[in-house]
Amino acid sequence: MKKFRWAILLAVLVACLLLWMQTLNVMCDQDVQFFSGICTINKFIPW
């Protein structure tokens, strides 16, 4: 039962990470000044 709980936790974390990446991509496309530094780093990480 404990393994099942860990699997759910991991799935939620992965989903949140994917959502965050989508949000970053949208912000980068709109060229928001605050996100420009993050976008530069984001380009070097192969998502």
Curated annotation (Swiss-Prot):
<keyword id="KW-1133">Transmembrane helix</keyword>
<keyword id="KW-1003">Cell membrane</keyword>
<dbReference type="GO" id="GO:0070298">
    <property type="term" value="P:negative regulation of phosphorelay signal transduction system"/>
</dbReference>
<dbReference type="GO" id="GO:0005886">
    <property type="term" value="C:plasma membrane"/>
</dbReference>
<keyword id="KW-0472">Membrane</keyword>
<dbReference type="Pfam" id="PF13998">
    <property type="entry name" value="MgrB"/>
</dbReference>
<keyword id="KW-0812">Transmembrane</keyword>
<feature type="transmembrane region" description="Helical">
    <location>
        <begin position="6"/>
        <end position="26"/>
    </location>
</feature>
<comment type="subunit">
    <text>May form homooligomers. Probably interacts with the periplasmic domain of PhoQ.</text>
</comment>
<dbReference type="InterPro" id="IPR020907">
    <property type="entry name" value="MgrB"/>
</dbReference>
<comment type="similarity">
    <text>Belongs to the MgrB family.</text>
</comment>
<keyword id="KW-0997">Cell inner membrane</keyword>
<comment type="function">
    <text>PhoP-regulated transcription is redox-sensitive, being activated when the periplasm becomes more reducing. MgrB acts between DsbA/DsbB and PhoP/PhoQ in this pathway. Represses PhoP/PhoQ signaling, possibly by binding to the periplasmic domain of PhoQ, altering its activity and that of downstream effector PhoP.</text>
</comment>
<protein>
    <recommendedName>
        <fullName>PhoP/PhoQ regulator MgrB</fullName>
    </recommendedName>
</protein>
